[in-house]
Amino acid sequence: MPQLDKFTYFSQFFWLCLFFFTFYIFICNDGDGVLGISRILKLRNQLLSHRGKTIQSKDPNSLEDLLRKGFSTGVSYMYASLFEVSQWCKAVDLLGKRRKITLISCFGEISGSRGMERNILYNISKSSPSNTGRWITCRNCRNDIMLIHVVHGQGSIK
Protein backbone atom coordinates (compact mmCIF):
# COMPACT_ATOMS: atom_id res chain seq x y z
CA MET A 1 0.00 0.00 0.00
CA PRO A 2 1.56 3.31 -1.00
CA GLN A 3 2.09 6.16 1.39
CA LEU A 4 -0.78 8.52 2.10
CA ASP A 5 -0.50 11.49 -0.19
CA LYS A 6 -2.89 14.06 -1.62
CA PHE A 7 -3.88 11.94 -4.60
CA THR A 8 -4.47 8.52 -3.01
CA TYR A 9 -5.61 9.49 0.48
CA PHE A 10 -9.35 9.43 -0.22
CA SER A 11 -9.38 6.08 -2.05
CA GLN A 12 -7.27 4.40 0.67
CA PHE A 13 -9.50 5.80 3.40
CA PHE A 14 -12.62 4.67 1.53
CA TRP A 15 -11.41 1.07 1.07
CA LEU A 16 -10.14 0.91 4.65
CA CYS A 17 -13.53 1.97 6.02
CA LEU A 18 -15.39 -0.36 3.68
CA PHE A 19 -13.34 -3.42 4.71
CA PHE A 20 -13.38 -2.49 8.38
CA PHE A 21 -17.15 -2.05 8.60
CA THR A 22 -17.77 -5.16 6.48
CA PHE A 23 -15.69 -7.31 8.80
CA TYR A 24 -17.15 -5.59 11.86
CA ILE A 25 -20.70 -6.38 10.80
CA PHE A 26 -19.73 -9.91 9.75
CA ILE A 27 -17.99 -10.72 13.07
CA CYS A 28 -20.22 -8.95 15.58
CA ASN A 29 -23.72 -9.41 14.22
CA ASP A 30 -23.74 -13.11 13.37
CA GLY A 31 -25.06 -14.16 16.80
CA ASP A 32 -21.85 -15.84 17.88
CA GLY A 33 -19.61 -12.78 17.88
CA VAL A 34 -18.99 -10.23 20.59
CA LEU A 35 -22.55 -8.92 20.59
CA GLY A 36 -23.91 -12.48 20.60
CA ILE A 37 -21.91 -13.33 23.71
CA SER A 38 -23.24 -10.27 25.53
CA ARG A 39 -26.80 -11.28 24.62
CA ILE A 40 -26.18 -14.81 25.91
CA LEU A 41 -24.77 -13.50 29.20
CA LYS A 42 -27.72 -11.12 29.68
CA LEU A 43 -30.17 -13.98 29.09
CA ARG A 44 -28.24 -16.20 31.50
CA ASN A 45 -28.31 -13.50 34.20
CA GLN A 46 -32.06 -13.11 33.74
CA LEU A 47 -32.68 -16.86 34.01
CA LEU A 48 -30.52 -17.17 37.10
CA SER A 49 -32.08 -14.11 38.75
CA HIS A 50 -35.46 -15.86 38.60
CA ARG A 51 -33.93 -18.66 40.67
CA GLY A 52 -32.61 -16.18 43.23
CA LYS A 53 -28.99 -16.45 42.16
CA THR A 54 -26.77 -14.32 39.96
CA ILE A 55 -23.58 -15.12 38.11
CA GLN A 56 -21.58 -12.53 40.02
CA SER A 57 -22.62 -13.29 43.56
CA LYS A 58 -21.56 -10.84 46.26
CA ASP A 59 -22.05 -13.35 49.08
CA PRO A 60 -18.64 -13.93 50.74
CA ASN A 61 -19.68 -17.41 51.95
CA SER A 62 -20.30 -18.60 48.41
CA LEU A 63 -16.92 -17.21 47.33
CA GLU A 64 -15.25 -19.06 50.18
CA ASP A 65 -17.04 -22.27 49.19
CA LEU A 66 -15.84 -21.85 45.61
CA LEU A 67 -12.28 -21.26 46.78
CA ARG A 68 -12.42 -24.26 49.10
CA LYS A 69 -13.73 -26.50 46.31
CA GLY A 70 -11.11 -25.18 43.89
CA PHE A 71 -8.30 -25.76 46.37
CA SER A 72 -9.44 -29.31 47.15
CA THR A 73 -9.78 -30.06 43.43
CA GLY A 74 -6.27 -28.75 42.80
CA VAL A 75 -4.89 -30.86 45.64
CA SER A 76 -6.64 -33.98 44.34
CA TYR A 77 -5.23 -33.38 40.82
CA MET A 78 -1.78 -32.88 42.33
CA TYR A 79 -2.04 -36.14 44.27
CA ALA A 80 -3.27 -38.02 41.20
CA SER A 81 -0.37 -36.79 39.08
CA LEU A 82 2.16 -37.48 41.86
CA PHE A 83 0.76 -40.98 42.29
CA GLU A 84 1.18 -41.65 38.56
CA VAL A 85 4.74 -40.30 38.68
CA SER A 86 5.65 -42.48 41.66
CA GLN A 87 4.10 -45.56 39.99
CA TRP A 88 6.06 -44.84 36.82
CA CYS A 89 9.28 -44.40 38.79
CA LYS A 90 8.71 -47.67 40.64
CA ALA A 91 8.05 -49.51 37.37
CA VAL A 92 11.13 -48.03 35.72
CA ASP A 93 13.23 -48.76 38.80
CA LEU A 94 12.13 -52.42 38.80
CA LEU A 95 12.89 -52.62 35.09
CA GLY A 96 16.33 -51.14 35.73
CA LYS A 97 17.08 -53.58 38.56
CA ARG A 98 16.18 -56.53 36.38
CA ARG A 99 18.42 -55.43 33.54
CA LYS A 100 21.13 -53.89 35.73
CA ILE A 101 20.60 -50.52 34.05
CA THR A 102 20.10 -47.30 35.94
CA LEU A 103 17.46 -45.32 34.10
CA ILE A 104 16.78 -42.64 36.66
CA SER A 105 19.78 -40.77 37.94
CA CYS A 106 18.09 -38.95 40.76
CA PHE A 107 14.66 -39.20 42.32
CA GLY A 108 14.03 -36.98 45.28
CA GLU A 109 11.27 -36.98 47.79
CA ILE A 110 10.68 -33.94 49.94
CA SER A 111 8.49 -34.35 52.97
CA GLY A 112 6.69 -31.12 53.82
CA SER A 113 7.02 -30.14 57.44
CA ARG A 114 4.15 -28.69 59.41
CA GLY A 115 5.86 -25.32 59.56
CA MET A 116 6.02 -25.15 55.78
CA GLU A 117 2.35 -26.20 55.58
CA ARG A 118 1.35 -23.45 57.98
CA ASN A 119 3.31 -20.94 55.93
CA ILE A 120 1.64 -22.06 52.70
CA LEU A 121 -1.81 -22.05 54.27
CA TYR A 122 -1.17 -18.64 55.85
CA ASN A 123 -0.16 -17.16 52.48
CA ILE A 124 -3.20 -18.69 50.79
CA SER A 125 -5.59 -17.49 53.49
CA LYS A 126 -4.01 -14.02 53.40
CA SER A 127 -4.95 -13.73 49.72
CA SER A 128 -8.59 -14.74 50.26
CA PRO A 129 -11.22 -12.19 49.19
CA SER A 130 -12.68 -11.77 52.67
CA ASN A 131 -9.15 -11.51 54.13
CA THR A 132 -10.20 -13.46 57.21
CA GLY A 133 -8.79 -16.83 56.26
CA ARG A 134 -11.97 -18.69 57.21
CA TRP A 135 -12.12 -20.66 53.98
CA ILE A 136 -9.01 -22.70 54.72
CA THR A 137 -7.71 -24.04 58.00
CA CYS A 138 -4.77 -26.16 59.03
CA ARG A 139 -7.10 -28.76 60.52
CA ASN A 140 -8.86 -29.36 57.21
CA CYS A 141 -5.82 -29.21 54.93
CA ARG A 142 -2.95 -30.39 57.12
CA ASN A 143 -3.14 -33.91 55.70
CA ASP A 144 -3.59 -32.67 52.13
CA ILE A 145 -0.06 -31.29 51.76
CA MET A 146 2.27 -33.92 53.16
CA LEU A 147 4.46 -35.30 50.38
CA ILE A 148 5.94 -33.68 47.29
CA HIS A 149 7.76 -35.81 44.72
CA VAL A 150 10.41 -34.12 42.62
CA VAL A 151 11.94 -35.82 39.61
CA HIS A 152 15.39 -34.27 39.22
CA GLY A 153 16.56 -35.89 36.01
CA GLN A 154 17.02 -38.98 33.89
CA GLY A 155 20.18 -40.86 33.11
CA SER A 156 21.00 -42.31 29.75
CA ILE A 157 19.94 -45.80 28.71
CA LYS A 158 23.02 -47.96 28.17
From Swiss-Prot:
EC number: 7.1.2.2
A biological process from GO: ATP biosynthetic process
Topology term for the membrane: Single-pass membrane protein
Gene Ontology CC terms, in alphabetical order: mitochondrial membrane; proton-transporting ATP synthase complex
Function: This is one of the chains of the nonenzymatic component (CF(0) subunit) of the mitochondrial ATPase complex.
Family, similarity comment: Belongs to the ATPase protein YMF19 family.
Assembly and interaction partners: F-type ATPases have 2 components, CF(1) - the catalytic core - and CF(0) - the membrane proton channel. CF(1) has five subunits: alpha(3), beta(3), gamma(1), delta(1), epsilon(1). CF(0) has three main subunits: a, b and c.
Name of the protein this chain belongs to: Putative ATP synthase protein YMF19
